[in-house]
């Protein structure tokens, strides 16, 4: 009886720990946002991102949230733009989001991990 209870608890814990969306590895760069493809104005201090053109064009991603994880930490960004030069697994984020998750802007382009939230 006790071993069955432990199995049920472990199964539930594992299911809760699994991310709802798969994680994606991609190249992370930064840009200076303005009026993006989603028609809103944003600045360097906003936690925003542009996703690759192919991904952006495949659905309605404006205002969706992404959790970006890098060497410096994690940040939640909002999709506000389309990145013409990005592959579908890459992100172009505001300078503030880049610094919070990836590190100094001088790094330029780094690999990061992200998923939809």
What residue spans do the PLM features occupy?
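Secreted/periplasmic proteins
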Residues: 2-117
């Amino acid at each position: 009886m006790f071993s069955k209870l432990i199995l049920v608890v472990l199964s539930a814990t594992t299911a809760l720990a699994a991310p709802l969306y798969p994680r994606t590895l991609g190249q992370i760069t930064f840009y200076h946002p303005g009026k993006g493809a989603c028609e809103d104005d944003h600045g360097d201090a906003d936690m925003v991102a542009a996703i690759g053109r192919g991904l952006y064009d495949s659905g309605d991603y404006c205002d969706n949230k992404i959790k970006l994880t890098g060497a410096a930490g994690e940040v939640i960004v909002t999709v506000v733009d389309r990145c013409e030069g990005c592959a579908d697994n890459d992100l172009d984020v505001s300078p503030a989001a880049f610094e919070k998750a990836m590190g100094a802007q001088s790094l330029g382009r780094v690999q990061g991990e992200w998923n939809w939230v």
